[in-house]
Every structure is written in structure tokens, then in C-alpha cells.
């Protein structure tokens, strides 16, 4: 049986990272607001409040989480571009998913995601090769180059979109 937590597999990439890989990843980040919107199209409130797996987040929580995560990533990129290997602040995703704003209509987060990704993609397309080598330090996972972080967040968006699309397929929605 497939691992419902990782419907597209865990994040991996081949090295070295090429300009073509970066361009593909940025395009995936740019496409995410539309892809996520399509994934939840025509779902009713009961469906939005259905966990994508036993013990997992609801579809609604997944949508809000993507925005929380990508806001954090955008800030991490800006820190890495303006400071030398800054140590970023992790956050407790599972606790954020329980806060009251995670019960808001998904449209609230979809609007945020659209705006956030316009700014983030603009920033990403402006990066020079030397910028892609800049890093931030995560207290738990260590140093991350911006080039790899672009791939990670492209995967992250596809990963959570697949949580929703695979749930829809399993339940024939």
C-alpha cells in the first residue's frame, strides 16, 4: 500500500542542481496557487473538513498549512539574501494547524497564497547564480542553500496538493 503521507514520495533531487531544475521548480511554485485551487474545486464543507488520512490534517488544514509554510519560506529567503547564513526560527506546524485561523474558509488562504507567490516568484526569478549559493541555517536540519530550498518548496506544494487529489480519487469525489 502507498504511504498516504507521501503520495509523490519524499523530497529528493539529483546533484548538481542545474539552471533547468531551478527554472522547473520556480514554475511549479508559480503554478501552485492554481493547482491547489483546482484540487479543492467544488468540495463542500464536509469534504474540506475530512482528513486526507487517518490521523492526518483535514483538507482545510492542509490548505492553510501550505500558506503558513510558504510565508515562512519567503521570509527565510529574504533573510538568506540579506544576512550571512542566518539561523531561522522553526515553528510547530502541528500546533499552528490547530489555531483558530485554520478553521477559516479556504478562500482566505488561497488569496494569500496567490499574492505571496506573486512576490516570491518575482524574487526567485531575480536571483543570480551566486544568490542560489546563499544559505540559511535551520536549527534542526542544518545549512540549506537557496537552490535546494527552491526545490524543497516546489515539492512541498505538489506534495500537499497530492494529499488532496489522492483523497478525492480514493473517495471518488
Swiss-Prot record:
GO molecular function, one term: hydrolase activity
Family annotation (InterPro entries): DinB-like, DinB/YfiT-like, Put_metal_dep_hydrolase_YfiT
EC number of this enzyme: 3.-.-.-
UniProt cofactor(s): Zn(2+)
Top-rank taxon: Bacteria
Record-listed Zn(2+) binding positions: 65, 156, 160
Keyword annotations of the record: Cytoplasm, Hydrolase, Metal-binding, Zinc
Gene3D superfamilies listed in its UniProt record: dinb family like domain
Cofactor note: Binds 1 zinc ion per subunit.
Protein localization: Cytoplasm
A single cellular component GO annotation: cytoplasm
HAMAP family reported in the protein's UniProt record: YfiT_hydrol
Function, as annotated: Possible metal-dependent hydrolase.
Assembly mode: Homodimer.
Family per record: Belongs to the metal hydrolase YfiT family.
Protein's name in the database: Putative metal-dependent hydrolase BA_2700/GBAA_2700/BAS2515
